[in-house]
Amino acid sequence: MKKVAIIGGGISGLYMASLLRLNSNYEVSIYEKNNSINLEKGYGIQLSVNSVKLLNKIGFQNINFEEKFFPNKVNFYSLKNKSKICDLDISAFNSHEDRYTTLQRFTLIDFLRNKIPSNLINFNKKVIEVQSESEITKVIFEDKSSIECDYLIISDGAFSKTRSLIANKEIKPSYFNSIAVRGNIDQNDLWNIDHNNISLFLGSNLHSVVYPVNQNGQFNFIAILRKKLNSNELANYSLFNNDEFVSSTLFEISKQVDRNIVENLRDIKCFPVFVSTEIFQPKNKNIYIIGDAFFTFPPTFAQGASQSIEVAHELYKNFENGNDHFNKERIKRTKMIDRKSKFNYFVFHFSNPLMIFIRNLLMRYLVKNNRFINSYVGKIYKN
């Protein structure tokens, strides 16, 4: 039996552990630096069909219907003209059970956590050293404890310390010249939008998204605002909890986004957006990286959670097939999604009136062009 150690108890780490527990050839444990799994309620995530199909293999379809929502389309709105541009039918990629799903992040994390016996999740385990010169990898933690494993899977987020340790250099994501504002809002406080689907609002150097996260009228709101920050501001993470900074950011957003939405947001959080600039692959064939530690995407194709699940599943299949590392197709696919996400960001944030007019005109045509949709969206949703 091979021992597998997973560093990080987020979506990718928990899902990977759930898969490995299906195979009696592996003994798996999770090591989380925090004192608990983050089960904070409220904030939403989107899961496209490519990840829902994989989650359903471990029983995701059995989650209480009330805790999920199944939007059929994305409605695009112009913040400048306060009008609808067009809509994209995302249900075209659905099957009977594999449907585009929105839900609270808590719901997914709780589902995955309950797949893992509590004694297999170890908390307060901050990695300070990785020794991997031999077939057996040794991991040393800050509390002076250590473990040995046959396979080490790193899934401790975009700012993965473990990834930097095995690379013998600091690997950090780059600031995307944007900040995000996230919050919750009730259906009763959302006027003049389709409550049964995803609403995407395009503005000047700004876009925002509103979508239901369950069947009970709760919605997730997120806005991405272009904003340059200097190195001192980025180093001072308390800045994003500063009431004055958050208020000024909300004021900036309210210049374009419906003030009624901004004024009725709850549980507001503000944070900088970071993205990956490279894909780092360990030289040691027994060490793997998944989730945001593998690659962090811009938040403009709603693929963060879906790709974490997809990459973990591919690694599991590689384990079963005896492959050492992700193949070239995975690298190619990651770069393709990254390019499209960056292109979306560029197009969503147009300021020039002529460019906005041309964009809106093209969008109305392209969302009805099946060949384009199958190429641009289908290549991601239909893995």
Where are these regions (language model features)?
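Conserved mid-domain beta->alpha element of the FAD-binding
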Residues: A5-N23, I153, V181, F245, ...
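Glycine-rich FAD pyrophosphate-binding loop
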Residues: R21-K41
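Conserved N-terminal glycine-rich FAD pyrophosphate-binding loop of Rossmann-like flavoproteins
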Residues: S36-L54
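C-terminal auxiliary extensions adjacent to catalytic cores
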Residues: M363-N383
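Conserved FAD/dinucleotide-binding core of flavoprotein oxidoreductases
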Residues: C86-Y100, Q104-I109, D189-D267
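Conserved Rossmann-like nucleotide-cofactor binding loop
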Residues: S12, S36, F159
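Residues at the starts of beta-strands that form the adenosine-phosphate
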Residues: K3, Y26-E27, Q218-F221
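Conserved N-terminal helical subregion
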Residues: K2-V4, R21, S48-D186, K228-E233, ...
